[in-house]
Regions:
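Residues within the alpha-helical elements of helix-turn-helix
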Residues: 64, 79, 97
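Charged, amphipathic alpha-helical coiled-coil/dimerization segments
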Residues: 42, 70, 92-158
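N-terminal leader segment of winged-helix/HTH proteins
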Residues: 1-52
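Pre-recognition alpha-helix immediately N-terminal to the DNA-recognition helix
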Residues: 33, 40, 44, 60-64, ...
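Helix-turn-helix DNA-binding motif, specifically the short coil turn and the N-cap/start of the second
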Residues: 83-86
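Short, locally clustered residues in the helix-turn-helix/winged-helix DNA-binding domain
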Residues: 35-38, 63-67, 128, 155
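Helix-turn-helix DNA-binding elements, focusing on the entry/boundary residues of the two helices
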Residues: 73
Length: 160
């Protein structure tokens, strides 16, 4: 039977207090760096989105619809890697806010196309300008060429 005493016998002597955290191994991983960069950029953008009453996912949904009027929910889920049950509530909320409408799809009678209302289009014109500015601020450590390269490399990872 293993006891706490047996387990502690297997441990090295008690380490000293950690003054500086060593994350050097994690910093060699693409996933860790991509996540940390995403958190930094999103953290900079979130307060700007709040003034429009949007979260990042709301902004992404509205942006895709803005640039693809008539898109179906299925296409939207594919574009944003969302599960259909998660999208249904978001679409309903945005529709109640008067930002989008659903209408019969011209080729598929079972599907509904999504389209922004005039209010939704006006909001997105302002929100996309704001996000572009906020993202420029959060990536100001990069040159224009570095920013383009970073986007291209990230897309290479998730688009294949």
């Amino acid at each position: 039977m293993n006891t706490a005493a047996d387990a502690s016998a297997d441990l090295d002597p008690a380490p000293a207090a950690v003054d500086t955290v060593d994350s050097s191994y994690l910093q060699t991983l693409v996933g860790y760096n991509a996540r940390m960069a995403a958190l930094a950029v999103i953290g900079h953008i979130l307060p700007g989105m709040a003034r429009f009453g949007l979260r990042i996912v709301d902004f992404s949904i509205l942006s895709i619809i803005f640039h693809n009027p008539g898109i179906t929910s299925k296409q939207l889920c594919g574009a944003l890697n969302l599960l259909p049950p998660n999208l249904v509530g978001k679409i309903g909320t945005l529709e109640k806010r008067g930002l989008l409408v659903r209408h019969p799809h011209p080729q598929d009678g079972r599907a509904l196309g999504l389209q922004l209302t005039a209010e939704g289009r006006a909001l997105m014109q302002q929100a996309e300008l704001a996000v572009a500015g906020l993202e420029a601020q959060s990536t100001q450590a990069l040159t224009t060429a570095e920013r383009r390269t970073l986007i291209r490399l990230l897309q290479k990872l998730y688009l294949g």
